[in-house]
Amino acid sequence: PMTKVLKADDINKAISAFKDPGTFDYKRFFHLVGLKGKTDAQVKEVFEILDKDQSGFIEEEELKGVLKGFSAHGRDLNDTETKALLAAGDSDHDGKIGADEFAKMVAQA
């Protein structure tokens, strides 16, 4: 579970901050949830949890549920938020976010 890598308090704070549709900001979320400053291995571990189908990529459908990946209380992102998140992370434009792309997003947050 995510709490193996991140503090439950931080996760809850971050989920609460973006409970309203249309408010999601991945950079702020990564800071609030405590992902910034984690080791490469820990960031990879978070990526693997979010990669529900273990394909090596976080696809659009998985991005939509990214907050649920952190907490059962998370909401689905709306289409605009999902597409913005994908656009921000998908540097090779293949329609999904790989582990390296995810690590880069965290580093740039």
Curated annotation (Swiss-Prot):
GO molecular function: calcium ion binding
CC annotations in GO: cytoplasm
Transmembrane segments: none
Span of domain EF-hand: 38-73, 77-109
Binding site for Ca(2+) 2: 90, 92, 94, 96, 101
List of residues binding Ca(2+) 1: 51, 53, 55, 62
Keyword Calcium applies: yes
Coiled-coil annotated spans: none
Domain of life: Eukaryota
Pfam family, any one: EF-hand_7
Function: In muscle, parvalbumin is thought to be involved in relaxation after contraction. It binds two calcium ions.
Family in the record: Belongs to the parvalbumin family.
Record protein name field: Parvalbumin alpha
Protein source organism: Triakis semifasciata (Leopard shark)
